[in-house]
Regions:
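Replace the tail clause
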Residues: 1-324
Length: 324
């Protein structure tokens, strides 16, 4: 628990895997969650990180020890404060203030990349808004929910969310899907739809639960814990598209509409391929295509159904069949 608290303090978020570098006295020097094998998407690879820490250990060891000591004391103080104070209105207000200080006003979420879906924080903010009427709390919720559902973190064909985003704008996910994330996010989007009366939130909640029931439920009625990020040895291969792949499945009109709405381009937005996302309002896309929103929605619904059927013919990611 102490190392996870240190990870949250240093990186703005926690999760598994957890990566912590320690002093010989087992005090944390550096902490984070997943680091890729190689540098990419604005993030250092694990090898780069090790080399940097080794360099600091050789040249700035005293500063590292001081940082480790300071962080250890901070974690101890927070632990004691939590046990002594319990949770009351003052604690909740302090938590909301802390979330606001870490909030990303452009893309939503809290802290820097990698960004994990902050389900518990969003539930806290929704409850706080319900009790206090504080508009800022709801603004943080809606900005974050919009960013996640519009980005590549969300599976726009099958529903459900990936485990986290490797970038600040929720575009490039680590494509693994976890049962617990999707259960929590379905609840948050449901509550948000009740508070805001926004149909798109209830749609995302339904699609997420449909995904869980369709792809993660065992024959005996339990639920599998996760699906992998990789298929055929490549991360994300099951999920990404090229314009040519789109045209092979759809009519010309459907392909044009879908590519415009879901950001499918010749150059791609991720390693030469396109991660599906919706960066523009549907009304803007409809205007560009000189059609009505109703007609565009009809084309997109047909296109998504065809593309999902085509995707199901690909080699799927491995299923972690531990049952919850």
């Amino acid at each position: 628990e102490s190392y996870m608290a240190a990870t949250v303090a240093l990186s703005g978020g926690g999760g598994w895997p957890m990566t912590v570098f320690l002093t010989p006295e087992q005090k944390p020097l550096c902490a984070g969650t997943y680091f890729p094998p190689e540098d990419g998407h604005g993030r250092p690879g694990f090898g780069t990180l090790i080399e940097r820490i080794a360099e600091l250990w050789e040249n700035e060891r005293d500063d590292l020890f001081a940082q480790a000591e300071q962080l250890t004391e901070q974690v101890k103080k927070q632990s004691k404060l939590g046990r002594a104070c319990g949770i009351g209105a003052e604690s909740i207000a302090a938590a909301v203030d802390q979330l606001e200080s870490a909030f990303d006003p452009r893309w939503g979420g809290f802290g820097a990349a990698p960004k994990f879906p902050p389900s518990a924080a969003l539930e806290l903010l929704l409850r706080h808004h319900h009790r206090s009427g504080e508009a800022r709390a709801l603004e943080m919720v809606t900005k974050t929910l919009d960013g996640m559902k519009n980005g590549g973190l969300y599976d726009h064909l099958a529903g459900g969310f990936a485990r986290y985003s490797t970038d600040e704008r929720w575009l490039a996910p680590h494509f693994e899907k976890m049962l617990y994330d999707n259960a929590l996010l379905a609840r948050v989007y449901t509550w948000a739809s009740q508070v805001t009366n926004r149909d798109e939130y209830s749609r995302v909640a339904r699609e997420t639960l449909d995904y869980v029931l369709r792809e993660m439920q065992s024959a005996e009625g339990g639920y599998y814990s996760a699906t992998d990020a990789d298929s055929e040895g490549e991360e994300g291969k099951f999920f990404v598209w090229t314009p040519e792949q789109i045209r092979q499945v759809l009519t010309e009109a459907e392909a044009r509409a879908f590519s415009a709405a879901y950001d499918v381009t010749p150059g791609g937005n991720w390693e030469g391929h396109s991660i599906l996302n919706t960066p523009r309002p549907l009304a803007e896309v409809a205007s560009e295509l000189e059609t009505s929103e109703a007609d565009l929605r009809e084309r997109l619904a047909s296109a998504k159904s065809k593309l999902l059927a085509a995707r199901l013919k690909r080699v799927p990611p491995l299923l972690d069949d531990k049952v919850v």
